[in-house]
Amino acid sequence: MKKIWLPILTALAFTTPAAAQEPQPRPDQLIFRDIFKELIETNTTLSSGSCTLAAERMATRMKAAGFPDSQLHLFATPEHPKEGGLVAIYPGTSKKAKPILVMAHIDVVEAKRADWERDPFTLFEENGYFYGRGTLDVKSQAAVWVDMLIRFQQAGYKPKRTIKMALTCGEETNGAFNGVEWLAANRRDLIDAEFALNEGGGGDSDGKGKVIGQSVQVGEKTFANFRLETRNPGGHSSAPVPDNAIYELAAALTRIEEHEFPVELTDVTRRYFAEAGAARGDATGRAMIALALDPADKAAEAIVNADPFLHSNLRTTCVATLLDGGHAANALPQRAGANINCRIFPGHSIESIKDELARVIGDPKVTITQLPPKRPAPPAPPLDPKVIGPMERLVAKYWPGLTVIPSMANGYTDATFLGAAGIPTYGIPGMWGDPDGNGVHGLNERIAVQSLYVGRDFMVDLVKAYAD
């Protein structure tokens, strides 16, 4: 999951190199582009691709650049031979400074050639954009990390901190083998770090080449799927009875639809609403500031709730996503069921949300069962000045006038597993997306050429700021 672009600014816009005529790529950018191209053109979907092959290809490049086998760790399990990954270790000079971990998932969402304007597994460059599945989510980040370590190796760079890189599979598919989860449970030594840099942050553009905001993801919601089910004896449809499984389920779903979880704020979301609201300068922005000051302000809440992202960022949400019922057109239903997908605000257990659903439904005939996978719900990482400070300084350098706004994701990433393992994980600023979402998880996914190249420079500078 790449960042769901936050509605940070609307009134202000800051020109970046993307707003100008496309410059000719530098020689180092062309080398990087080749790595990016190879990753995009290696199909890593769960159905027909191989993360293992992509990881092996990156390891081959790194070995050719001088990395010894002892610093390259390919991994896969016998049960999931195509869902492997790569951990690379670039040693630092200090024995006291803890390592940093840079990470990216290399699996991608399914993409059907018939639905796309171009082959999703061929890299195309057109009209200032790169097109292909994974261009923004998130093989761009994986390519940056591989290219960065290769350049460090070739230049003989000697950081104080050891830099670790993890390219993993399984982030995009619920229930699939997850490389970060496996590493945390089985090879913690390979990824142990003071903190990790992940996807989830990033910038917003106005869609015309102007970057209008940069954020760092600090924490995310966890999720749970619940199966609601009702059962009745059934019978012939010519003789309806009061107890009808479909009607009972429909009543339960209506109660969930009408239920609004209360407004809540963490330190991160309070700061997000205050700072992003101040930057907007419109009615929604003023309401955001008011809510940051007083979460009980109902008038402000009503204005903010009109934005689906902001509404969800304030609370737990539960929504029906799948529905089934009945067994024959001329029979009373014996069973009806629905999936309820909940995105749970930090500080709440999954069990407490299940109990809340039962209370809202108020019908003991409706059973509620949590479905796999079951993910951990770690606390948000701290707003550590040692982590946030370098981001702020570099954002000010690259995009004068912009600040880094901390945010909480309504979705989730592999940071869940690292956070549960005690490694604070941050979704970094840098690359930016357009207001329409750039086709992430959808058709014709793309990233602006300058978003990739400028974001790459920013990300490498950020790692060096931490490593030095």
Residue ranges with predicted function:
Residues T45-S47, E79-P81, T93-K95, I106-E110, ...:
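Solvent-exposed loop/turn segments at secondary-structure junctions
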Residues W5, P81-E83, A97, R118, ...:
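Short, solvent-exposed loop/turn segments at the edges of secondary structure
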Residues W5-T16:
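Bacterial N-terminal signal peptides
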Residues Q21, R61, G201-D457, Y466-A467:
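Metal-dependent amide/peptide-bond hydrolase catalytic core
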Residues E126-D137, V404-I405, I447:
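Short pre-catalytic strand/loop immediately N-terminal to key active-site residues, enriched for Gly-Thr
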Residues E22-R133, A142, F152-R161, I340:
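Acidic/His- and Gly-rich active-site-bordering loop/insert found
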Residues Y129-F130, L136-S215:
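Acidic/histidine-rich catalytic neighborhood of metal-dependent amide-processing enzymes
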